[in-house]
Amino acid sequence: MKPTRPFHQTPVITIDGPTASGKGTVAALVAAELGFHLLDSGALYRLAALASVRYDIAADDAEALAKLVGELHITFREGIAQLDGADVSTDIRAEEIGNRASAIAIHAPVRAALVARQRAFRKQPGLVADGRDMGTVIFPDAALKVFLTASVEARATRRHKQLIQKGFSANMDDLLRDLRERDERDSQRAAAPLKPAADAQLLDTSALSVDQAVEQVVQWYRALVPQS
């Protein structure tokens, strides 16, 4: 596999894919394998939402929200989201925080501040960025762009296992229906539709273990950047 674009001094690997394709897990493990920084862009929006609640900033105060986004101390380590040094991985998954994230993201100043924060994660020795628009808008010059795919059945099985392990009840038929509906919404929406970048590598993980998927991504990257 040959490089198709000039490399930035600090390399980026972007990973996208549909819900329950394993992109978050794969991104975290690839970052750990290569010693790269990690960015979970979806979690970043939720972190901003959580902070706005904690600092009592109104969801319609665009200027104050944008200022807050620029000042937050945020880190991602092995899939753990930290805000001001505290693990808030569970807190940001609350439904009300998800709704708040959608509410604040409609403001152009907030989106601009979040884009700047995402790009600021690009530091030596490199970055693995997980999320929509990473390879098309945020890091169009990424060294490697990966789009994970998997059958809806495989993804539902994974999601079912995750929920059971966390102590939640789960129905496979409901999960299958929810994933199909989510895929349709994501692929047809006007803003950031679910589709791979034109120069992305497609990786079907239906029959792959997490370790196998990680190994393939790392192999692709090292083929492009042999000294890595």
Curated annotation (Swiss-Prot):
GO BP: nucleobase-containing small molecule interconversion; pyrimidine nucleotide metabolic process
Gene Ontology CC entries for this record: cytosol
EC number(s) per entry: 2.7.4.25
GO MF annotations, alphabetized: ATP binding; CMP kinase activity; dCMP kinase activity
Positions annotated to bind ATP: 17-25
Reactions this protein catalyses: CMP + ATP = CDP + ADP; dCMP + ATP = dCDP + ADP
Location relative to the cell: Cytoplasm
Keyword hit for Nucleotide-binding: yes
Short name of any one Pfam family annotated for the protein: Cytidylate_kin
Keyword annotations: ATP-binding, Cytoplasm, Kinase, Nucleotide-binding, Transferase
Source superkingdom: Bacteria
Claim: Cell wall biogenesis/degradation is one of the keywords in the record: no
Database matches in HAMAP family: Cytidyl_kinase_type1
Similarity-based family: Belongs to the cytidylate kinase family. Type 1 subfamily.
This protein's name: Cytidylate kinase
Source lineage: Bacteria, Pseudomonadati, Pseudomonadota, Betaproteobacteria, Burkholderiales
Originating gene: cmk
